[in-house]
Every structure is written in structure tokens, then in C-alpha cells.
Amino acid sequence: EFSLTSYTFENIVRHVLGETSPHYSLDRIASWLENGSAVMRIRGLRYIVYRAKASIRILDRTGVITRAAELAKVIGIDFNAVLTRGSQFRVESLMARIAHPEQFILPSPSREQVAQQRAAECLPLVLEPQSSYYTDPVVVLDFQSLYPSVMIAYNYCYSTCLGSLEDIAAGPEAAGTHDHSRHRLGVSSLDLPPGLLNALKEHITVSPNGVAFVKPSVRRGLLGRMLQELLESRIVIRDAMKRWGSDNAVLCKKLDAWQLGLKLIANVTYGYAGASFSGRMPCVDIADAIVQSGRETLESAIRFIHSKHAQWGARVVYGDTDSMFVHLSGQSRESAFRIGQEIAEAITRMNPAPIKLKFEKVYQPCVLLSKKRYAGWMFTSPEQTEPLLDAKGLELVRRDGCLVTQRVLEGTMDVLFRTNDLSLVKSYVTGEITRIMRGELSLQEFIIAKEVRLGTYSGRVLPAHAK
């Protein structure tokens, strides 16, 4: 909901309601009510009533109850389960309703079966960024819902998987059985009738990691059906929000809760298949197929962009799972928007539906430091004149540092992007350090807030926040 450095009642009230709330300890309130004068008892009661009313206002402002109720309706689970159960329960609830009419039963593997399946072998592509300060435009392109789209496009599902070609060739020894028609698949084994692969050889898709799946012409996967319905429903809901949301705030909140719930379910479906430690129904063959297909999709897009260097002058300087940062040397910001759209449309045409590359934004200028650490002035449309500072992974947006670090870094970025003059950056930072040394800043700016996980730290010396 809100990314805060501290989740005390007073801090939440300040950020959500824009009010300043006094802080009284429970001991003090108890002493007012039990031993205090009439005035102090009234003060204690007023504070308790204020906290109760403020809590209700926070719930209303954040829409927690509305979202949970609408999500329960969409998924088909009870209200309490939305708040207390995890994402696997939600995926399974939807999948069970789709599987039942098809007369499929969802297996329930034991912890031993989950632990005995082979380890995952495939990793998403995360390129080492070409760390630099870029004054020319950097276009950010993102594959929209990459893993759900891959599962739909290639029909990856429990109900369509024939297993790894390597395991099929290895025979019963790999599956731990003496039945020569069975081979290993995820946490269990699969019985393939003799001659089935031969009969289906024209109707099989082999994933990049060597796992065979039947095409939709033979059987449409349950996961693909579920995801396609989720994504299509979300598009319809978002269109309805644009059409009627501005005239009806209550309806807009309800529709937004629906589309957010559908998005969350679609995004965690891969995790349901890949949860190899605590999963309810993991299948490493399917999970690896999804990851490796996504990796090859991104690699293919990068190769295509580099092959068109003469046309666009584009070079991929960073890539992470489903997104690319494309540097356009010598191009204007207006040209960057045009070229970015051309790249997105060309790569979308290369891939089967519904895999789609989406043009996200343009950074100019931009600093790439390392993996998942960058910042830049963001433009989302050619008409935008005032940039927005966008950052990821830096102390500027992290919640485990102090306010003075965030403020100074934000000011540093502003001076650098506005002037491109390192001497002015140095002057600004020197001035801030001088103010710190003179004690001109509030002590609140130096408070470090970091999550404490007692029992997880090694060594004799605990970190400062755990003492």
C-alpha cells in the first residue's frame, strides 16, 4: 500500500491522512484512566476514540476492505482467506474451478515428493549493465505480462506436458519405477502409451529446455485458459474504468480492485508452478520451460535490435527478465519516442500472440550503476515537458536508510540532470556536508529504519538495527 520507513500508528496517520498524531504509551494511557484526575481520564478516552476513528479513516482511504471483498468475489474465496492465505491458495481456487468441468483432479504431493523432484536449472536473463551516465535518450521497453503470455502462447500447462525428452529417453530408471511406459514428471511420474509421441510428433511443441507439450489443437491447457480469461477480463475492466470511472468514484474503486486482483493472480501463476520448496503443486519441468522461453524471447529481441543498428542506432545497455534499456546515441527525445514504438511493434510481430513488447518510457538523462540500480529523468509521452525523477534500487527510494541520505541524493540527481556539471554537483554535496557538520539538520533526518529479523543474523556482532 504505502512504502514507509516506519509503520507506527503516528507515521501512518501522517502519510495517509496528512495529520499529526500525538504518541502516548499504553502505560501512560492506563495510568490516566486508572489513577488520573477527571481531566486526564477524559484526555485518555478522547485519545482512544481518536485512534479508533483514525483507524477507520485509514481503512477507508486505503480501500483495504473494498479491495479484499472484491478480490474474494473475483477469485471465489472467502473474505478472511484474502487477508490470511497466500497467492498459491488463490491460484488453486481458480484452477480447481476450471479443472472440475474437464474432469481433472489436482494432485496433493507430500513434502517428501516435493523435496525429491530435481532442482530448477533455468534462470531469467539479467544482463550486466553498461554502467555510465547517458545524456542521450534511453528507451525502456517491457514485455507485458511475459510469463503469463508465454504460458498462453506455447500452451504450457500440467494438462499438456508430456515430460522432458531426456527423461523419456532415460526410461523407467529416471522415474524410479520398473514400468517401462512411465517416466519422471515434476513430483510424480507420467504414463505415456506406446507410440503416443510418434502419433503426436506434428502436434508437439518442445520448449527450449527440452520439455514436450502438446499444441492447443490436441488439448488446450488449463493454465493458458485461466490466464487468457484473466488478462482479457482485465482489459475489459480497464476499458470500463476509462469510460465510466470518472463519473462514479465508488464504481471506479470497485473496478480498480477487480483489475488489480486479476493482475496479481496472473503474475503469481508462474510462481505456483515453480514453488519448489513450499509449493502445493510444483512442477520444475513446467517452471523451467516458462523461464527459459522468457529468456530466449528477451535474447531474441536484443539480437534483433542490434541487427538493426544501422537503421535505429540502438544498443541494449541493460536487460532484466522482461525489460530492456535501449540507448539511442545522437537521437532527440522526439525521435526516441518514434523509434521506441517501432522497436516495440517489430518485436511484437516476431513473437506468437499474446506476447507483446510495450514501449514504457524514455529516460534523458540517465544513470546506470549496476543491476537493478538506476535513475533518470522520465518522460512517458512526447508532449510531456516537465520530467519526473524515477529511480530504482538507490538510497533515493530505499526505506532502510535515513532521510538525509534520500534528500541529498535526490538533490544531487536534480543538479546533475539539470546542469550536467560535476563541479556544481560537488558544490551542492559539499554544502550539505557542511550543514551536517554544523548540526543544522533535525535529528529525525538521521534515523535509520530497517526491518529486524532476530535469529537470522550470523556472527557475534549484530547489525545496529538489531541491537
Regions found by a protein language model. Give the residues of each.
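Catalytic cores of large soluble enzymes that bind and process phosphate-bearing ligands
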Residues: E1-T5, M40-R51, S87, V138-V139, ...
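Active-site-proximal helix-loop-helix substrate-binding element of RNase H-like nuclease domains
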Residues: E1-K53, G176
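Common nucleic-acid-contacting/processivity interface regions adjacent to the catalytic cores
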Residues: L33-N155, L162-L165, G171, H178, ...
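Short, surface-exposed acidic
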Residues: E19-I29, T160-G163, R315-V317, P354
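Catalytic nucleotidyl-transfer cores of nucleotide-processing enzymes
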Residues: E1-L4, E112-A275, K372-E395
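C-terminal polymerase-core module
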Residues: F325-K467
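Short beta-strand
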Residues: R315-D320, F359
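Secondary-structure transition/capping motifs at alpha-helix termini
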Residues: I65, C161, W244-D247, S276, ...
